[in-house]
Amino acid sequence: MVTLWWPCLVLALLSGLETSGFPRSPLRLLGKRSLPEGVVDGIEIYSTKISCKVTSRFAHNVVTTRAVNRADKAKEVSFDVELPKTAFITNFTLTIDGVTYPGSVKEKEVAQKQYEKAVSQGKTAGLVKASGRKLEKFTVSVNVAAGSKVIFELTYEELLKRNKGKYEMYLKVQPKQLVRHFEIDAHIFEPQGISMLDADASFITNDLLGSALTKSFSGKKGHVSFKPSLDQQRSCPTCTDSLLNGDFTIVYDVNRESPGNVQIVNGYFVHFFAPQGLPVVPKNIAFVIDVSGSMSGRKIQQTREALLKILDDMKEEDYLNFILFSTGVTTWKDHLVKATPANLEEARAFVKNIRDRSMTNINDGLLRGIEMLNKAREDHLVPERSTSILVMLTDGDANTGESRPEKIQENVRNAIRGKFPLYNLGFGNNLNYNFLESLALENHGFARRIYEDSDASLQLQGFYEEVANPLLTNVELEYPENAILDLTRNSYPHFYDGSEIVVAGRLVDRNVDNFKADVKGHGALNDLTFTEEVDMKEMDAALKEQGYIFGDYIERLWAYLTIEQLLEKRKNARGDEKENITAEALELSLKYHFVTPLTSMVVTKPEDNEDQTAIADKPGEEAISASTAYLTSQQSSHSPYYYVDGDPHFIIQVPGKNDTICFNIDEKPGTVLSLIQDPVTGIAVTGQIIGEKGNNASSRTGKTYFGKLGIANAWMDFRIEVTTEKIILGNGDALSTFSWLDTVTVTQTGLSVTINRKKNMVVSFEDGISFVIVLHQVWKKHPVHQDFLGFYVVDSHRMSAQTHGLLGQFFQPFDFKVFDVRPGSDPMKPDATMVVKSHRLTVTRGSQKDYRKDASVGTKVVCWFVHNNGEGFIDGVHTDYIVPSLF
């Protein structure tokens, strides 16, 4: 089932903060004045309001959070909001002590140039990241002086889409602390009239919800208000933490006295079409199921469960078959069969015996399914007034038979020839989702990701419920010739029960007296035509009262829908066509101030007397590639970085300084060193040293490298062991093993791990902490050298001030001075004197390599080299960092 998110409520309010010093001591607090309730580490979030205004399914949403720093020193305050992936951010403002810093939407390339020019020091990453199944997280943080107030305000818009007969509004509430004034205020205006409206919360009892929640609707207007008091927010009567942690949902629908409804405002029109009471068109459905080895275990079990449930819901008028593909292709029957009780019972027995096998031959599986549907129609095995549907489920990329994506697309396109839709279900993250989406879109279907979770079978069933009841086929929405411009998509292969078709456009003449819309389609029994006529004077009078919401809503709805459809069309366009589509979508995105995949929101924020600029981009559904995932944090050439690579060379680009310090650690192979240890986030990173081959392997004088790395998060009970051969992910007692030959992304709540075949892997924690491990491969027959690993910290700004380790101790700013530069023993490498941490050291100018972009060549990094295992620069001596094991 696809859940339809209502944008003004699809957000998580995650008010958090990072401090620049150590945590407060409880003993110190005893002597301080008492702080107002709801203050956490000196920061009080005293107001959060979500204001939502919905007019004719188009939602305009404003999230406002107000905070004050009641501490006696500056603090960092973070503002996090989760919003639907289908929503477009339209504005963000940051106000500190009455001074407002607005965001502006610019072309992505222009924004990137501004970003690189503006940031002169420190690290600033992209602000919007994918978060879970349907959400994106918008994050911005700012330093707030003692006693100062800050206001965050985010605005975004979205067209609500109807699913299974209703619009669902979903709110994930998680303020993380008591908020003196917390409010959700939603106003709905529907010219057709509201037929039902309800609201509920998973995190609060009905008794408490009843007094905090009010909901009402009458005629065209609906209202929902949720205002819990401080006491109602408490997790227990005497607790100071909040129970607001869960889902808040609102559902509603509108009256449908006629199949269609047309609204016209300021020269723009929108046509909603959702007929009811029609008989269901019989469907001919071919399920093409991946049974390759990667589907083993839980995936194949959940697939069987979902298919059995789908069989229970099949109607006797339907026809079906199952096509299984691995290295080859097998089918349940040679042709489609009717869903009689006897055939369904036989189908259940077949499904129960589905087993995983070997490789993934997507091409042959799809072509067999297409051939079966085509033949059923040609041989008159299915009713004349029926509709065909092809559904594919796969969890990976094609790796046998025809495996070139572009060739598979060509073969499928030529075989289907536009006669029926293809729906692609991508199971998990180890697949090319862009390919599945392009393949489906160009064949009049869509792609859907099925998340590897306990409810995967329910997700599969939910998809089937969407397409189970076609009421019309070949639907065409027609308007007066020469009377309209810039029409959105007006042709659809199916209309499914409980959904809604939406078409928008512009009128050539705003002063017309009448407007007519015709909808034609093939029904189960006959061809149908629905006509909607609009008297413009009556329309103007009827819509005057909606002005209190927002008057240009139809124009913005048209722009939103046009951009959305252009971006879909762009995915399969080539050459000049793609350039023209891109230019049109970009022009509209800029005109209407939408953050889309073609634009970025530029946010300038004050930081220590110097403004810094960050950009908010629109992430896509496809998993972020490694290059994107870690380069967003390195967009400025002056961003601080920390890494260890080579023999092993530790490289520290000092925060706030345009200079770099490096040192080596000489230890015998087998030694395990602590690189990062953060007791607050629970993150720890260790590395084990390897030596050269043969007799040199155990020598302390030969070259040494890191051959094994361990990354763990104690609070998540998660660990990763990385060697030059394999990667082992441990989640509690469960282990998953991958090789460096894989290209795969593994996600779970709070974490994403991406392996890029034979290159690198990216580990990203939700808090804004990212690492990259680079694989260095040498000639296997080399007599001395062997493969080794490099470790790079590319985003550490959310790690605590208590972080330590050979790398971690340098995440916080520190000062040093270099002077008395003089000739060294090597004429090309001058010596100098460095004063750091109260030590006076002799250092040497040299260079190392940064291998993130190219593991074979690398990029030169000039640094001051500290001798003797970093003595005087690192805390203590290097042997203090030796630990007994990786974990």
Curated annotation (Swiss-Prot):
Record domain VIT: where: 29-158
Signal peptide location: 1-21
GO biological process, one term: hyaluronan metabolic process
UniProt cross-references to Gene3D superfamilies, sorted A to Z: von Willebrand factor, type A domain (3.40.50.410)
VWFA domain sequence ranges: 282-442
A Gene Ontology term for the protein's cellular component: extracellular region
SMART domains in UniProt: VIT, VWA
Family: Belongs to the ITIH family.
UniProt name for this protein: Inter-alpha-trypsin inhibitor heavy chain H3
Species for this entry: Rattus norvegicus (Rat)
